[in-house]
């Protein structure tokens, strides 16, 4: 018996999940919820680059909630709307449908997230008799689960440093690259990703998760953000980066244990 699955938000990440649901022999795609008029009405298969599968995208989330999907993959963009995304997922849970999501990154480790985000989800999951799971690669595997697994073959650990290096030159979400990250913008541009506290909100729970897994506790987290302008102009597949505009950024979180820098997480984006 196939598990009936709906996908909400076939964006840069959701379209990958959509294709995986379609291809999996034990999953049946029942619904596809979208936000844009450009995607509404189009076949789910078309949106992920394959033949038609007979499921048309819709902007009517309520219809999906009233349908027979057992699980909803929630992948709608949430960087600028985390509480709205939580409200969406609460509605899914209260409708008696399980949620698997990659949208609100810190919820990978909910124990380190403000209760304004976690309490509504817990209450809704209990009310609906269903489950809620947030996962991903970063976070969800590479910078949290993998370091903890590798720690099992270590005798002594003084510190752990996780570094993600990512080339955004071909990233399909232009808003994320040029507005949220602020690439191609002048140094004085107030990029969301460079706003103090944003990186700590998104990835601070990673440090707490690793610390807890190793039986210790973080006292404080320090955040630093460095932004580097381009020395010369160049083009990428998604746009032009003029000389003097931002072309790279390093965001660093340092978790202190008893005053000692013990856990460090770097994101090097360019």
Where are these regions (language model features)?
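Alpha-helical support elements that line or immediately flank enzyme active sites
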Residues: 140-152
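Short, ordered loop/turn segments at secondary-structure junctions
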Residues: 35, 78, 97, 103-107, ...
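Rossmann-fold NAD(P)-binding glycine/threonine-rich loop
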Residues: 86-87, 95, 103-130
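N-terminal glycine-/serine-/threonine-rich beta1-alpha1-beta2 phosphate-ribose binding loop
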Residues: 1-95, 215
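Conserved active-site and cofactor/substrate-binding residues in soluble primary-metabolism enzymes
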Residues: 8, 12, 16, 67, ...
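Active-site-lining helix/loop region of Rossmann-like oxidoreductase modules
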Residues: 8, 151-270
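Hydrophobic beta-strand scaffold residues
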Residues: 29, 99, 131-132
């Amino acid at each position: 018996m196939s598990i009936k699955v709906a996908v909400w938000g076939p964006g840069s990440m959701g379209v990958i999940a959509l294709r995986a649901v379609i291809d999996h022999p034990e999953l049946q795609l029942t619904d596809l919820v979208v936000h844009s008029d450009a995607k509404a009405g189009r076949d789910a298969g078309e949106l992920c680059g394959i033949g038609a599968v007979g499921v048309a995208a819709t902007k009517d989330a309520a219809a999906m909630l009233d349908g027979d999907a057992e699980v909803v993959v929630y992948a709608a963009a949430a960087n600028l709307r985390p509480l709205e995304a939580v409200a969406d997922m609460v509605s899914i849970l209260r409708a008696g449908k399980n949620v698997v999501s990659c949208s609100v990154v810190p919820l990978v480790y909910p124990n380190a997230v403000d209760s304004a985000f976690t309490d509504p989800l817990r209450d809704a999951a209990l009310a609906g008799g269903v489950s809620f799971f947030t996962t991903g690669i970063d976070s969800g595997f590479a910078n949290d689960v993998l370091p903890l697994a590798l720690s099992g073959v270590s005798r002594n650990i003084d510190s752990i440093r996780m570094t993600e290096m990512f080339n955004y030159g071909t990233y399909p979400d232009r808003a994320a690259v040029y507005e949220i990250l602020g690439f191609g913008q002048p140094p004085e541009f107030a990029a969301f990703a460079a706003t103090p506290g944003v990186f700590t909100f998104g990835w601070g729970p990673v440090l707490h998760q690793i610390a807890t897994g190793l039986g210790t506790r973080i006292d404080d987290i320090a955040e630093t953000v460095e932004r580097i302008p381009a020395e010369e102009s160049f083009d990428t597949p998604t746009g032009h980066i003029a000389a003097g505009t931002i072309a790279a950024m390093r965001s660093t979180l340092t978790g202190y244990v008893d005053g000692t820098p013990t856990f460090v997480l770097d994101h090097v984006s360019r």
